[in-house]
Curated annotation (Swiss-Prot):
UniProt keyword annotations, A-Z: Chloroplast, Developmental protein, Membrane, Plastid, Transit peptide, Transmembrane, Transmembrane helix
Subcellular location: Plastid, Chloroplast membrane
Species whose genome carries this gene: Arabidopsis thaliana
Family: Belongs to the RETICULATA family.
Tissues where the protein occurs: Expressed in root meristem, root vasculature, distal region of young leaf primordia, leaf bundle sheath cells, hydathodes and pollen grains.
Ranges annotated as biased composition (Gly residues): 70-89
Topology with respect to the bilayer: Multi-pass membrane protein
Transit peptide: 1-59
Protein name, entry field: Protein RETICULATA-RELATED 3, chloroplastic
Amino acid sequence: MAAMAAKLQLSAKSDQSSVRLPRVINLSRDPTTRVSFPRNGSVCSLHTNFSSPHLAKPCAGGGGGGSTGNNGGGSGSGGGGGGFGGSGGEASEESSPWGPIGLFIQGWRSRVAADPQFPFKVLMEEIVGLSACVLGDMASRPNFGLNELDFVFSTLVVGSILNFVLMYMLAPTAATLGSSQTLPGIFRNCPSSHMFEQGSFTVMNRFGTLVYKGMVFASVGLAAGLVGTAISNGLIMLRKKMDPSFETPNKPPPTVLNSLTWATHMGVSANARYQTLNGIEFLLAKVLPPLVFKTSVIVLRCANNVAGGMSFVLLARMTGSQSVEEKTEISEKEKDD
């Protein structure tokens, strides 16, 4: 009996040893192990290098649990915002620890993702375009603007802000690229960026974008006009305090009237020019080599800003917000007396 019991124990041990156990991968000893998931409708391809055995989140910011987790808030793909900080969408913007600065950085990255040429366009707009704008402004003033340098400096400051705001607002984002449901109210079916945006939009939809952007730009121009007028008048007062014998060659622009002039200029002239410019650049980017395209951007931005600077001076003369003749006539009468 003892011999039979010993044989049964030996056979049981041999049966257990014959069972194949699953292979256990020790991630701490094999740091180069790669885990990949195939691309499908809800999960993007993921390649993870386990460089640390204490990896807390192997799929940071993933789209599980019903969250979209996409690039800048658009639906369809991407995990963790595609490098835009956070999991994308409005939730990440609202929870940004940097406040307005964080929101601006996220918006900038989203625009770069939608248009890789966006930083170059902004750079050309601020350097070449703004220089051309100042030249156009000075060329439209008497004595090439040398007697109105306070106005020219005000145009320089306000123009640099407005140029950036215009490009930032018109540029498509990764979240709204191809979306027509981002504008409010009756403009909800209109293109979200500019009237020549790619998509199946009607003529009225595109015209609606022109109207909506015009109202937005007019509001921005009104605020910038207030700032610019305050800067210009402040410089005049400062120079008078430093040099009591100084006489202003021109009548200081009225704050409200000059602000309304800026609003009209932005809502009508600047809006129409920038809408058209974005459409032209969109077409040129498809047919021209990168170097030729960048050269064309420089030329277009330069010509656009020269026209913008000249049109603003003409409009300011028409509205009387920056009048030279009235001040000259007053000075002549004072000399006669």
